[in-house]
A protein has these predicted regions:
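Short amphipathic secondary-structure patches
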Residues: 2-9, 13, 52, 56, ...
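N-terminal single-pass transmembrane signal-anchor helix
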Residues: 19-50
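Short, ordered "entry" segments at domain starts
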Residues: 129-247, 356-399, 403-408
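Feature marks extracellular polysaccharide-active and adherence modules
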Residues: 164, 187-189, 199, 206, ...
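Short, low-complexity, Pro/Ser/Thr/Gly-rich segments in the mature regions of secreted, periplasmic
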Residues: 242-258, 415-431
Length: 431
């Protein structure tokens, strides 16, 4: 009997199944790894966005801290303590308080790094804080340190003439030949149509910014010329501290009246002011002259001179305010102090004085020839130059409610040669 050859069928299911199971395992492992990687990327993106936003907020706080410290420096803050306190307070108001929630704030004067490391007019603020991560903790990164740095400094303002009044004509030149020429910027705060009225005179500044509009000859070094519609600027000397005094050193009950002769006056409080006339020659010794009522009046071809002097014009108690009038051919040589609380300030009017029509205008007139070095600060009263006088100096700065130049008068303003720069300062971010 013949039997056929038997061939067994291969066991297909087991071998292929093992291979398929292995492949599925590899896919699952790859998928799991990819999912972890994707989660890590998502977590990294989320944490990066979170920390970027947080650093932006911290940078805002650092900027505010540096600016506040520099502003305190501009105001003459005594010692680093006041500057540090101002910077810390500004940072806290922006959500970052020193030694709270792991926040550290460092304030350096001068900055500890960067371009201004040797300049004591700059303040550096550094804020650091360690923050927990949102998602990166699954990869072992539990926290990250965020930091922000800013540097702000005190710089010279580019402006040296301010007409602060916000109504009517703030700056005017009246009469042919009258001019105001400033080797610096001019600011006119009035929003009136005739805020700057050059009339038949001329006004020039390196820049001219007018809240309202102007008429007549107005020019500047800027390509755009005299600018209009500019927002009003604050009083640039608002931080200047008023001199303190009590009682009367001179002039009570009778005002100090110098009529002729050669006289030397000493600093102190002059109740009822100072009046000089009849060709007198007066020398003011260095220091601060408090004019409590009565003001300062010089006339009759008199001569006045003084170096390192400041005149503070006020009216307290029973004394009535009087303006500053230099008229009648006065010949004057007056220089402001170069150091101390009133450095760079020649005339300083009490800000609380309320102007009265016809009684509060400060006048320099009558062919007076004056050489001044210092700042004329009359924030609430008017300042008028007229009568063909020539007013010039190494530097002069004018801040008044209104400023008028008339009667063939030439008025120059410049602070370029002043050793410590413009007494009017501004605070700006530098780094």
């Amino acid at each position: 009997m013949t039997y056929g050859t038997y061939r067994a069928k291969p066991a297909r299911g087991k071998g292929r199944g093992d291979r398929r199971a292995g492949a599925r395992g590899q896919v699952l492992a790859l998928a799991a790894f990819s999912l972890i990687a994707l989660c890590a990327l998502v977590g990294l993106a989320a944490d990066t966005g979170y920390f970027f936003d947080y650093k932006r907020k911290m940078q805002t706080a650092a900027d505010a801290a540096a600016l506040a410290g520099a502003e305190q420096l501009r105001r003459g803050g005594n010692g680093n303590g006041q500057i540090v306190n101002a910077a810390d307070a500004a940072a806290a108001s922006n959500g970052f308080t020193n030694n709270v929630s792991g926040t550290g704030i460092q304030v350096h004067i001068p900055p500890g790094s960067g371009y201004y490391t040797s300049d004591g007019s700059y303040v550096e603020a550094i804020i650091t804080q360690t923050r927990p991560t949102l998602f990166m903790g699954i990869l072992g990164l539990q926290s990250a340190t965020v930091s922000a740095r800013a540097v702000a400094g005190v710089q010279d303002s580019p402006n040296c003439i301010y007409a602060l009044g916000q109504t009517g004509t703030g700056l005017a030149t009246n009469g042919s030949g009258s001019s105001l020429s400033a080797a610096c910027g001019i600011v006119v705060n009035s929003s009136a149509a005739s805020a700057l009225n050059a009339g038949s005179g001329a006004v020039f500044g390196t820049s001219v910014a007018v809240a309202g509009t102007y008429s007549g000859s107005c020019s500047s070094s800027e390509p755009s010329g005299c600018r209009t519609g500019v927002p009003p600027q604050p009083d640039p000397l608002a931080q200047l501290a008023d001199p303190q005094f009590s009682g009367c050193d001179f002039g009570a009950p009778t005002p100090v009246n110098v009529s002729g002769g050669v006289v030397t006056l000493n600093p102190g409080t002059y109740c009822n002011g100072i009046s000089i006339g009849s060709g007198a020659s007066v020398t003011f010794q260095p220091g601060v002259y408090i004019l409590n009522g009565g003001g300062l009046s010089v006339s009759g071809n008199s001569t006045i001179q003084g170096t390192g002097v400041t005149f503070y014009n006020t009216a307290q108690g029973k004394y009535s305010y009087g303006p500053v009038n230099l008229t009648g051919g006065t010949l004057g040589f007056l220089n402001a102090p170069t150091s101390g609380p009133t450095a760079g300030i020649l005339f300083f009017q009490d800000r609380t004085i309320i102007p009265k029509s016809g009684k509060s205008s400060n006048v320099i007139a009558g062919s007076s020839n004056l050489n001044f070095t210092g700042t004329f600060y009359f924030p609430t009263t008017d300042l008028t130059f007229s009568g063909g006088g020539q007013v010039s100096a190494n530097y002069t700065i004018f801040v008044a409610r209104t400023i008028t130049v008339g009667g063939n008068t030439t008025l120059s303003a410049n602070f370029s040669s002043l050793q410590d720069g413009n007494p009017i300062k501004k605070v700006t971010l530098a780094e």
